[in-house]
Amino acid sequence: MSPEIALNRISPMLSPFISSVVRNGKVGLDATNCLRITDLKSGCTSLTPGPNCDRFKLHIPYAGETLKWDIIFNAQYPELPPDFIFGEDAEFLPDPSALHNLASWNPSNPECLLLVVKELVQQYHQFQCGRLRESSRLMFEYQTLLEEPQYGENMEIYAGKKNNWTGEFSARFLLKLPVDFSNIPTYLLKDVNEDPGEDVALLSVSFEDTEATQVYPKLYLSPRIEHALGGSSALHIPAFPGGGCLIDYVPQVCHLLTNKVQYVIQGYHKRREYIAAFLSHFGTGVVEYDAEGFTKLTLLLMWKEFCFLVHIDLPLFFPRDQPTLTFQSVYHFTNSGQLYSQAQKNYPYSPRWDGNEMAKRAKAYFKTFVPQFQEAAFANGKL
C-alpha cells in the first residue's frame, strides 16, 4: 500500500503523526528502507464517518529483519498517546521510564509518534543484546565490537528464537561500516533514483549456531554506492574464516571496500589525465570526449589518405584495467550496414605510465596497426 493511499484512510486528527512516520521515518542503520504501515483498521463504530482508521501495523527494518508492531490510537481521543503491541516479541517489555516522548506526549508535534518509535527501537536493541548472554561465544563477539566506538555505535543485533530440540539459537549482526564515500566523483552518484537516501555500506553477519561453525557474511550497499563501484557483482567479500571473530573480520571488509573506493577515485583522476594528454597530442584530431566522467574519447585520424576513427573506452578501474581501442573505417561497411571496425586490447600498455606516456605509446601503436587495419577493411568491408 502506498503512503498516500494509507494516509487517505487515517482519521484526519491522527494523520499528521502517521504522515511523519511514512514520509520521513527512517529508523536504525538501513537508511534505504523507510517505515511503512499495513493492516489499517478502525476502533470506531460503524456509524462514525470516514476516514476513521486509528490502528495499524508498523513495519520497521531492523538488523535484516522486519519488526511488525501494532500501534493503536483512539480516534475519539486523538490527543492521547497510542498503545503498542509487539507482535512475536512478547518477551520485549520496554521500560516506560526511558520512553520520554511517550511520557510527555505532545499531540501538537507531528513527529511525536516517530520519536517514540525511535526510543522503542533503541530499547529493542538492548533487549536483543541481552539475549546474547545465553551464548558466551556470541557475547564475546558483541563485547569486542562494543569496545570499538566505530563499530559499537553503529550496530544492530537480532537473536533468533532458541531451537527447543538443540538449545541453539542463531544471531545476526548488522554493522554500518566506517567507510568514507564523500570523494567518489559526483557523476557516478547520479540518476539512481529520486531519493537515494544516505550513502552507506552495511555488513550483515549471520551466526547459524552459537559456536560459530556456520557463519554467513553479506555486504549491502546503498543504490548510489553500488552503482558507483560497478554494480552488485563488482565487490566480493571474503568468506568468514573458520575460527575467526568479527573484530578481525570486519576491518578486513572495511579495508577491501576502502580500497575499492580509492580505485574508483584514482581511476577518475587518471582518466582525466589520460584524456588531457590525448587532447594535447592529437589536437584537432579529437572529435569528442566525455568531459564529465572521462570514460570515452574519439579521434579522427589519417594515414596515407586513409581516414579512420579510433574510439577509446576507459574502464571504471583505469589504469589497472586497460582501455579498449576500437578502430573504425569511415569508408567501409559490414553486411549489417555498420561501419567496419576492429577492437584491440592487445597493444603496449602499462598502468604505471602517466597520461603523456600513454598518449605517445598510443600514437606509435596507431602507426604500426593502421596498415593491417586498412588492409582488413578493404578485404572484409564494402564501400
From Swiss-Prot:
Residues annotated with Phosphoserine modification: S2
One MF annotation (Gene Ontology) recorded for this entry: polyubiquitin modification-dependent protein binding
GO cellular component, one term: BRCA1-A complex
Entry-annotated residues carrying N-acetylmethionine: M1
Subcellular location: Cytoplasm; Nucleus
Pfam family, one: BRE
CDD domains the record matches: BRE
Transmembrane segments: none
GO BP: apoptotic process; cell division; cellular response to ionizing radiation; chromatin organization; DNA damage response; double-strand break repair; mitotic G2 DNA damage checkpoint signaling; negative regulation of apoptotic process
Region (UEV-like 1): 30-147
Superkingdom to which the source organism belongs: Eukaryota
Keywords for the protein's UniProt record, in alphabetical order: Acetylation, Apoptosis, Cell cycle, Cell division, Chromatin regulator, Cytoplasm, DNA damage, DNA repair, Mitosis, Nucleus, Phosphoprotein, Repeat, Ubl conjugation pathway
Region (UEV-like 2): 275-364
Biological role: Component of the BRCA1-A complex, a complex that specifically recognizes 'Lys-63'-linked ubiquitinated histones H2A and H2AX at DNA lesions sites, leading to target the BRCA1-BARD1 heterodimer to sites of DNA damage at double-strand breaks (DSBs). The BRCA1-A complex also possesses deubiquitinase activity that specifically removes 'Lys-63'-linked ubiquitin on histones H2A and H2AX.
Protein family (similarity comment): Belongs to the BABAM2 family.
Subunit structure: Component of the ARISC complex, at least composed of UIMC1/RAP80, ABRAXAS1, BRCC3/BRCC36, BABAM2 and BABAM1/NBA1. Component of the BRCA1-A complex, at least composed of BRCA1, BARD1, UIMC1/RAP80, ABRAXAS1, BRCC3/BRCC36, BABAM2 and BABAM1/NBA1. In the BRCA1-A complex, interacts directly with ABRAXAS1, BRCC3/BRCC36 and BABAM1/NBA1. Binds polyubiquitin. Component of the BRISC complex, at least composed of ABRAXAS2, BRCC3/BRCC36, BABAM2 and BABAM1/NBA1. Identified in a complex with SHMT2 and the other subunits of the BRISC complex.
Record remark on domains: Contains 2 ubiquitin-conjugating enzyme family-like (UEV-like) regions. These regions lack the critical Cys residues required for ubiquitination but retain the ability to bind ubiquitin.
Protein name (Swiss-Prot/TrEMBL): BRISC and BRCA1-A complex member 2
